[in-house]
Amino acid sequence: MKLEASCGTATSEVPKPEKKTARDAEPSSETRPQEVEAEPRSGSGPEAEAEPLDFVVATEREFEEVLAISGGIYGGLDYLPSRYHSWLRDPDRTVVLAKRNGGVIALESVNVIDAGETVLVEGLRVAPWERGKGVAGLLQRFCSQLVKRQHPGVKVARLTRDDQLGPRELKKYRLITKQGILLVRFNASALLAGLGARLAALRTSGTFSPLPTEAVSEAGGDVARLLLSPSVQRDVLPGGTIIQDWQPYRPSESNLRLLAAKGLEWRVDSRARPRVLTLCTRPFPIPHGGDGTWRYLNIDAFGSDGAQVQSQLLWHLQRQAPRLVGLNVMCQLFLEPQLWSQLADFCQVGLGLELVKGYTEQYLLEADI
């Protein structure tokens, strides 16, 4: 089903295709910064107006075309090849494509969360040959109007970005919170082979000794008790928000059900008096290297105790590495900005991981809709 749009004005409904009611067992989404054109440079762009765009609900048939417009995105860390099919099966999500002359030139996903009050904007990307023509602005405007019609209870739009915010973004969006981003890489087999000796050396030098950590069970209700606690929301969660692999959730019963379907692994310093909480998203393949040997591992850390973040990071690496033997891993750790240097040193000097790039930040933005 499609809509002709010569000026980016949505004038009729785009029905959502029937979807399976059961959620996919894999994590169904990953939020990322807006790709390339968060805003058109001027209005809708003269070239975008010259040739009408068709906005259509994405299907399995367009998968290869979506890959074709996504080459090189996020430096080989693109999640979409691993998420596209499960996105289409997500009953709370609509993936919209912009087409010109029958070919896919742009994509954006809108995902309704927070019990229907928030739309999460994800995955915006425009084909390299179409950038600078206002396509992104037209697609964003259409998706916003679509959400308003299909979900009248939605109050705000949220998105995450990792690029520097300019005056235009700060005027349009409220900054809810920010986290530091630490990106490292390693070979899982090599990490396992040398980890024992490295930890022994750290203990001997008095540099680091793992602190006790505790499991957090979703089935036993530990996750709900922690995340629905006012003190955890106030003192531990950044901006009172659970940010899971770039995707922000308000702490609520409905969102905890969404998170429970993703197979996350949680850790905390103390269930009785929590100060640091971490969660690890299941690793998935990424295009980096082009040989199928790379996986992406995402760990979100909440709290400001550096030694405890180190201990929980180590626990997650020890947990995941045996499952990734023979593979290379890009690991992104999100943490309090003031802890970045401490954790970067721990990862490089202590654990022998390779730092991929310097300090960057993840921004959580919000705007009324």
Swiss-Prot record:
Gene3D superfamilies associated with the record: 3.40.630.30
Segments forming domain N-acetyltransferase: 53-188
Biased composition, class Basic and acidic residues, residue ranges: 15-26
Annotated S-S bridges: none
PROSITE patterns registered for this protein in UniProt: GNAT
Region (Disordered): 1-49
Catalytic class of the enzyme: transferase
E.C. number: 2.3.1.-
Keywords, in A-Z order: Acyltransferase, Transferase
Single Gene Ontology MF annotation: acyltransferase activity, transferring groups other than amino-acyl groups
A Pfam family matched in the record: Acetyltransf_1
Other comment: NAT16 is the ortholog of the ectothermic vertebrates enzyme HISAT (AC I3J7Q8) responsible for the synthesis of N-acetyl-histidine (NAH). NAT16 protein, unlike fish HISAT, has only trace enzyme activity for NAH synthesis.
UniProt-listed PANTHER family: LOC100145250 PROTEIN (PTHR47403), N-ACETYLTRANSFERASE 16-RELATED (PTHR47403:SF3)
Function according to Swiss-Prot or TrEMBL: Probable N-acetyltransferase. Shows only trace activity toward L-His and no N-acetyltransferase activity toward other amino acids. The physiological substrate of this enzyme is unknown.
Protein name: Probable N-acetyltransferase 16
Protein's gene: NAT16
